[in-house]
Amino acid sequence: MEYGSIVTSVADIWKEASTESERYSQIIYGESVKILGKEGNFIHVESKDGVKGYVKKRLIGDYSEKRYKIIRRFKAKNLILPFGSYVNDEDISDMKIPEVYIKNINEKYDPVILAKKFIGVPYLWGGTSDFGFDCSGLTQRMIRFGMNYEIPRNSGQQRDASIEVKDLEHAKRGDLIFFEGHVGFYLGNNEMLHANGSFSRITINNLKDNSEYSNMLLSIMQKIGRYKY
């Protein structure tokens, strides 16, 4: 099986071999993809979380096994590496990335603390980077980077794969709260951090402040889920 690696800051995964189709998801610098085929200027790929779609051919290069993680957005002369990008020894040498930006791939971080760094970042359908997140892209990226643990890509899959928590009173910081087509991190004290499509950015909202928005969320809440990292 042939593999490739993303060689640009962020690559969109499209439903079809056209940028006019739906953006399914995104993959960022250094992430690997399985090559399924080729169609014109696009490569048919499968990401490591099982998303299949099309990526522009010029955005995929050779795959390298030895990697590190970018812990802050790195601005080079011609390329900005998003938080969570994977780099190898050759990248570090060629790009002259300062060591303060990189960490060993196995080091762990609290996903909630990480997520708070991105409050105010724009909401982007299909987004998985600090250029823009959707709800499940945010939860997946923070858990993947922070705990080196894989959860599914979309909110419905994340919901189904999680361990159910009885109610908000039993929820713990870092649990995921699932709604119809939506997910966010539970922070405690009835607060949730999420990539908020209604506000077009990442926000913290109180679920029990009796506002119209919080009442709407509670009316469509489906499950509180937990992952054992």
Task: Mark where each language-model region is.
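Short, surface-exposed beta-strand-loop junctions and turns on beta-sheet-rich folds
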Residues: S21, G50-G53, G61, M95-I97, ...
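Structural motif
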Residues: E31, S85, G174-D175
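Active-site nucleophilic cysteine motif
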Residues: A115, S129-G146
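Second-shell loop/turn segments in exported
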Residues: P122-D130
